[in-house]
């Protein structure tokens, strides 16, 4: 497991945010934005997003096997120092492990994410079939009447939710369209 995550981190350091990540970040200039992501790649932060909740952890970090969410035992790795030797111990004496939510583990950040959704005025959901739980269940925390935009190239069954507008396109194209919908005056100016 350790060597597998060492290999993934090597790929991570060469990854760059796409236009969708940058457009999400650009919304922070006009709105209070919280990003809730299932991805572990930190590309939202690389694009400049400042408030990100990582549901499934972060590939660039390692933690204690005994107490994985204790900040005292979470370490951030760098491209220069990202390989972890198998058997390396955390500060509490347990094995150091990737700061990743493994299959069948609980998702501790789901409660803070649900709290954010309960207070949002607009919910944007990108790149999901709404079949992966518990993240798919976050929509149920949205207050009645709050507009929800779902951006995904594939049709998604949203019958269980009200006020969902689907933008059936990829993340970058969908974020461009959403930006136009949120700022119709500025998108008209750029077209003129």
PLM segments and residue spans:
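Conserved catalytic alpha/beta core of Sir2/sirtuin-type deacylases, generalized to analogous enzyme cores
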Residues: 1-192
């Amino acid at each position: 497991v350790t060597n597998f995550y060492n290999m993934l981190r090597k790929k991570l350091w060469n990854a760059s945010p796409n236009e969708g990540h940058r457009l999400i970040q650009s919304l922070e200039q006009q709105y209070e934005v919280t990003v809730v992501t299932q991805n572990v790649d930190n590309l939202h932060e690389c694009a400049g997003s400042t408030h990100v909740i990582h549901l499934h952890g972060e590939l660039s970090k390692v933690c204690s096997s005994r107490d994985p969410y204790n900040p005292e035992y979470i370490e951030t790795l760098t491209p220069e120092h990202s390989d972890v030797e198998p058997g390396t111990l955390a500060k509490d004496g347990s094995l150091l492990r990737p700061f990743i939510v493994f299959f069948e583990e609980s998702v501790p950040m789901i409660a803070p994410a649900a709290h954010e959704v309960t207070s949002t005025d607009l919910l944007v959901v990108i790149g999901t079939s709404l079949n992966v739980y518990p993240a798919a269940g976050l929509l149920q925390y949205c207050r009645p009447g709050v507009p929800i935009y779902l951006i995904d190239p594939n049709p998604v069954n949203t019958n269980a939710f009200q006020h969902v507008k689907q933008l059936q396109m990829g993340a970058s194209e969908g974020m461009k369209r959403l930006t136009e919908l949120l700022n119709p005056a500025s998108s008209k100016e750029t077209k003129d």
